[in-house]
Swiss-Prot record:
InterPro entries: DUF2470, Haem_oxidase_HugZ-like_sf. It comes from Strobilurus tenacellus. The lineage of its organism: Eukaryota, Fungi, Dikarya, Basidiomycota, Agaricomycotina. One of its GO terms (cellular component) is membrane. Pfam families: DUF2470 (PF10615). The structure of strobilurin A was used for the development of the major class of beta-methoxyacrylate agricultural fungicides since its beta-methoxyacrylate toxophore targets the Qo site of complex III of the mitochondrial electron transport chain and prevents adenosine triphosphate synthesis. Compounds such as azoxystrobin (Syngenta) and Kresoxim methyl (BASF) are among the most widely used fungicides worldwide. This class of antifungals are used as effective treatments against a broad range of destructive fungal plant pathogens and make significant contributions to food security. This is Strobilurin A biosynthesis cluster protein r1. It is a multi-pass membrane protein. The chain crosses the membrane at residues 108-128, 169-189. Part of the gene cluster that mediates the biosynthesis of strobilurin A, an antifungal polyketide that contains a key beta-methoxyacrylate toxophore that targets the complex III of the mitochondrial electron transport chain. Strobilurin biosynthesis begins with construction of benzoyl CoA by step-wise elimination of ammonia from phenylalanine by the phenylalanine ammonia-lyase str11, oxygenation by str8 and retro-Claisen reaction to form benzoic acid, which is activated to its CoA thiolester benzoyl CoA by the dedicated CoA ligase str10. Keywords: Membrane, Transmembrane, Transmembrane helix. It is found in: Membrane. Pathway: Mycotoxin biosynthesis.
């Protein structure tokens, strides 16, 4: 018989509901952006929250009520993930509604994660490419580079979409895209983390 995993949020949902009830602008932003509630909203109550969704009760200008269920994707794995996720959702909603500026990254920083991971495999491949090795056939190296391109290519495209929206100059954007093309995931992960940090900072300034 399959074991039922307990929801990590339900037992502490009262804490989250209490904190969010003090942020009416956040709940309205959720309702407008994620819930697609049309028309003026005079108030929003958070009626429920769990690992998979939050439920809002919106009071419209004519006095009527509208219930909105907003899915959390992916679901929250633990309670400690709730506040960062809700804050990120708030920043995205405020950006989408035009109430705050989209975060812009203006400088390039070589990701420390790359120094611990993919840089060594790429360096090894470069060495084998230019230094003859009697144990490798001529076809193996091109195949290895083709595999790198096949794996890193889609990641570079994803990085380009992030850079197009969130990077403020061509040099920085190209650096992240080329870095991803050569070294892979450490570059797009670093860029996404910097964007998230910039979002949090922008919200902190308007709270």
């Amino acid at each position: 018989m399959a074991q039922v995993v307990a929801d990590p949020i339900v037992d502490k949902s009262a804490i989250l509901k209490s904190e969010l009830s003090k942020q009416p602008e956040t709940l309205i932003a959720y309702a407008k952006w994620y819930g697609k509630v049309a028309g003026p909203i005079t108030g929003v109550d958070l009626s429920a929250i769990d690992a998979k969704s939050l439920t809002l009760i919106c009071t419209l200008s004519d006095g009527s009520k509208q219930q909105v269920r907003i899915e959390l994707s992916p679901p929250l794995a633990r309670y400690e993930d709730a506040k960062p996720r809700l804050l990120e959702m708030k920043t995205r909603a405020l950006e989408g509604l035009g109430l705050t500026k989209t975060p812009v990254i203006t400088n390039f920083i070589f990701p420390s994660l790359a120094l611990k991971t993919t840089i060594w495999s790429v360096a090894g491949l470069l060495y084998l490419t230019f230094v003859p090795n009697p144990y490798l056939t001529g076809a193996n190296i091109p195949r290895a580079w083709a595999a790198v391109g096949l794996i890193h290519g889609p990641q570079a495209i994803y990085t380009a979409t992030l850079a197009r929206k969130h990077v403020g100059n061509l040099t920085t954007g190209v650096s992240y895209v080329l870095g991803t093309l050569v070294f892979g995931f450490p570059f797009w992960i670093d860029l996404r983390q910097r964007i998230t940090a910039a979002r949090v900072e922008s919200v902190a300034k308007i709270q």
